[in-house]
């Protein structure tokens, strides 16, 4: 009877582990359709969606927006949060301060060109003082998800 109880306990423990964390790798996040047309990344307990201008062939003053959600895609209030986006394209580096812009949105402006090689590092400091960071390649072409079930969240 003890062996059966241990087996049942072990089985219950395995079942409680759920699906692998691979459901949140960058490739899976890139295949997801985002609410604002940006690129999605995980940062700690949060999802950050980075939206940059896609049609600026030369560097000029352009907006940058980061949307904050939790892993259940529920909006997180941006009030009291602040952030910084570092954009890298070729030899050009641009740092843009982000401030709350309503609802779950932080935004700022800075000079950058829309390039498929554009890379971004986003750092968000939440009202409780915790800072989360994520890396993006926001203008890389999307790769379709070939899973018959679509991207899993």
Q: How would you label these PLM feature ranges?
A:
Residues 2-5, 17-153:
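Intrinsically disordered, low-complexity terminal tails/loops enriched in metal-binding residues
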Residues 9-13, 17:
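Hydrophobic helical h-region of N-terminal Sec-dependent signal peptides
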